[in-house]
From Swiss-Prot:
Functional description taken from the UniProt entry: Specifically methylates position 2 of adenine 2503 in 23S rRNA and position 2 of adenine 37 in tRNAs.
Annotated gene: rlmN
Cofactor descriptive note: Binds 1 [4Fe-4S] cluster. The cluster is coordinated with 3 cysteines and an exchangeable S-adenosyl-L-methionine.
Disulphide-bonded residues: 119-350
Name of the protein in question: Probable dual-specificity RNA methyltransferase RlmN
InterPro entries xref list: Aldolase_TIM (IPR013785), Methyltransferase_A (IPR040072), RlmN_N (IPR048641), RNA_MTrfase_RlmN (IPR027492), rRNA_lsu_MTrfase_RlmN/Cfr (IPR004383), rSAM (IPR007197)
Length: 363
């Protein structure tokens, strides 16, 4: 029987049977054809996976028994197990998922007036080394397969099924650097955006990067209508290098050139994430410098008050200073908002993922 392989995943990191969630519709059609089955069955399989969200291949009752047995022999549905689920006072939910090899990742469900947003993880750990973030404390263990990323959304959706709610948007801003796992991230995007997949609209999906410049050009060339964000966090090279060591490899001027290429190629505006760190990058003169950097750039700035991470030394910017920073940007014509804080009490806010678990492991 023909095995369906994805060359973008290193073989030694794969389970013996891959998750069927890792495969796009056309890839499943190919596998069906090569195994003597009708390709139209792929749409039925996708319906069972993403509309009915079954827990076993046996539940796919409009498929023949022999096909269900083939699926069972070649794939698993998911290797994610829910280890812990926490709920914040504001309704934010954090899921700790255990992977097939014992590693754990975190996924966050955020509730908004306009719907439910899921923040997914793309790597076990992170190699980028941002000096304010908990996710990078243990380094990078491995990349996730597309199916492990897709399964995060499916698992959260199944939790929402209990209250007849729906995942309405997805942000790729969890643990890891998405562009460090580029091919699997792209497969994930295509699966969740497909009308027979999770059918989440492109403009309801946001990808964020710390600034891996070659991949920004590659992503621009995809011409996807996905929302795109860059973790900027500084108005100049000196401060950005202090906060984000990646800036030493991928310089700020070169990053801004890549941003301009992306905007020209896609016609889309870009979002800049700007964490405010007390006494580091949060003064009015920093806002003036940021406005100058972003002059004539089609963009939006998200201001993020720093979240507490015990292993880090950064302090929160006072509230009145945050508003002064915002006011300065607005006066210079920069489109800007202050991000609403969510999940702070369960360590689910920006920069906090994996912090609590890592503390528990080292006790």
């Amino acid at each position: 029987m023909t095995q369906l392989k994805k060359t973008s995943v290193r073989k030694e990191l794969r389970t013996e049977q891959p998750s069927i969630y890792s495969f796009e519709l056309d890839e499943i059609k190919q596998w069906l054809t090569e195994n003597g089955e009708k390709p139209f069955r792929a749409a039925q399989i996708f319906e069972w996976l993403y509309e009915k969200r079954v827990s076993s291949f046996d539940e796919m009752t409009n498929l023949s028994k022999s096909l269900r047995e083939k699926l069972e022999s070649n794939f698993v549905l998911t290797t994610l197990k829910t280890a812990v689920k926490q709920t914040s006072q504001d309704g934010t939910m954090k899921f700790l998922f255990e992977l097939h090899d014992g590693y754990t990742i975190e996924t966050v469900l955020m509730r908004h007036e306009y719907g439910n947003s899921v923040c997914v993880t793309t790597q076990v750990g992170c190699r980028i080394g941002c000096t304010f973030c908990a996710s990078t404390l243990g380094g990078l263990k491995r990349n996730l397969e597309a199916g492990e990323i897709v399964a995060q959304v499916v698992k959260v959706q199944k939790a929402l099924d209990e209250t007849d709610e729906r995942v309405s948007s997805v942000v790729i801003m969890g643990i890891g650097e998405p562009f460090d796992n580029f091919n699997e991230m792209l497969a994930f995007l295509k699966i969740i955006n497909h009308d027979k997949g999770l059918n989440i609209g492109a403009r309801h999906i946001t990808v964020s990067t710390s600034g891996i410049i070659p991949k920004i050009y590659d992503f621009a060339d995809q011409k996807m209508q996905i929302n795109f964000a860059i973790s900027l966090h500084a108005p100049n090279t000196e401060i950005r290098s202090r906060l984000m060591p990646i800036n030493k490899a991928y310089k700020l001027p070169d990053l801004m050139e890549a941003v301009k290429y992306y905007i020209e190629k896609t016609g889309r505006r870009i979002s800049f994430e700007y964490g405010l760190f007390g006494g580091v990058n949060d003064q009015v003169e920093h806002a003036e410098e940021l406005a100058e950097l972003l002059k004539d750039v089609k963009c939006h700035v998200n201001l993020i008050p720093v979240n507490y991470v015990p292993e880090r030394d950064y302090v929160r910017t006072p509230r009145d200073q945050i508003f002064a920073f915002e006011k300065t940007l607005k006066s210079r014509g920069v489109n800007v908002t202050i991000r609403r804080e969510q999940g702070h009490d369960i360590d689910a806010a920006c920069g906090q993922l994996r912090a609590k678990e890592r503390q528990d492991e080292t006790r």
